[in-house]
Amino acid sequence: MSRPVRRKDLMIVNIGPHHPSMHGVLRLIVTLDGEDVVDCQPILGYLHRGMEKIAENRAIIQYLPYVTRWDYLATMFTEAITVNGPEQLGNIQVPKRASYIRVIMLELSRIASHLLWLGPFMADIGAQTPFFYIFREREFVYDLFEAATGMRMMHNFFRIGGIAADLPYGWIDKCLDFCDYFLTEVVEYQKLITRNPIFLERVEGVGIIGGEEAINWSLSGPMLRASGIQWDLRKVDRYECYDEFEWEIQWQKQGDSLARYLVRLSEMTESIKIIQQALEGLPGGPYENLERRDFDKKLNSEMNSEWNNFDYRFISKKPSPTFELSKQELYVRVEAPKGELGIFLIGDQSGVPWRWKIRPPGFINLQILPELVKRMKLADIMTILGSIDIIMGEVDR
């Protein structure tokens, strides 16, 4: 007896672009066979603003306020990469004090970015409580940013040759207090999240990426280190003054969503270690000490005081707004919270770049999403997408 052949009906589902779990205006066209994902096609471009072309029509100092709109949750890194390129082209030396302050701000920005990844990631998989916890700690970071830069977000703090202003009175003590407090909160996160059996059920073994596969897809940041590859540009390139501090690359072997979570959680602890060392070893010490020593110098008429040393300044000689970019090519990169943030820069002996190519980590890391979600369940899409950590401002540029 012959049986009738049943036709296999596939369902096409649109997720986004206006969806709370999309982390921006991302649209996914998902093909389903029941609850199983057959195909996934990301649709990009909803937040494209022509950031590269804008850079090619602006002087660097004019373009700095724009770059904070790429990854608007880690704006210090976009500012850092924007000034690092011209500094290398012009052989501009950065005072040691300015470099230390840059590192402090970069690591605080890394913590803020990872915190705002953790909360929505937990909310995506059904845990609402950590979402409110992370905003409590993030407020402390933003208070430090506001005290030092005047802005909670979009800081516009980095300058070619240094930073815009020195640290204000009492800022170092306030930051040290935050470091001590935050380490206890990371332990609380581990108790609340890492040992939760429901959380482990949702993330363990979901979205596995092997080490060789991660390299072939050009993944970077926590996505790469969670797959067993110990690669961190702070150790590899040794930019700023990271080689003066003691810290370890955080990595995992499993390559799943749980491994990516563990890497980011551990990175926040390492960032605190770097910040504490930078604050304690800051050349010149707190600003009030520098001011007092400068006053003593005037009383004693010591014109060549060590406290007037180049390394104790917050910026070297300020270049003019029409600072010319020499005629050469250059690729610079930093280890941003989401991965390798790079700039390919071509100067043509004018005040504006001839070519300004952005290499955003989120755009590169997002490419592997269709491969990760195939043959998974519909509910796992949000878990995997959340573990990648994207911001559409830098994906679309």
Swiss-Prot record:
It is found in: Plastid, Chloroplast thylakoid membrane. Keywords: Chloroplast, Membrane, NAD, NADP, Plastid, Plastoquinone, Quinone, Thylakoid, Translocase, Transport. GO terms for cellular component: chloroplast thylakoid membrane. It comes from the Eukaryota. It catalyses: a plastoquinone + NADH + (n+1) H(+)(in) = a plastoquinol + NAD(+) + n H(+)(out); a plastoquinone + NADPH + (n+1) H(+)(in) = a plastoquinol + NADP(+) + n H(+)(out). InterPro entries: NADH_Q_OxRdtase_suD, NADH_UbQ_OxRdtase_49kDa_CS, NDH1_su_D/H, NiFe-Hase_large. One of its GO terms (molecular function) is quinone binding. PROSITE patterns: COMPLEX1_49K. The keyword Membrane applies. It is an enzyme of class 7 (translocase). Its EC number is 7.1.1.-. It is a peripheral membrane protein. The keyword NAD applies. One of its GO terms (biological process) is photosynthesis, light reaction. Its main location: plastid. NDH is composed of at least 16 different subunits, 5 of which are encoded in the nucleus. NDH shuttles electrons from NAD(P)H:plastoquinone, via FMN and iron-sulfur (Fe-S) centers, to quinones in the photosynthetic chain and possibly in a chloroplast respiratory chain. The immediate electron acceptor for the enzyme in this species is believed to be plastoquinone. Couples the redox reaction to proton translocation, and thus conserves the redox energy in a proton gradient. Belongs to the complex I 49 kDa subunit family. This is NAD(P)H-quinone oxidoreductase subunit H, chloroplastic.
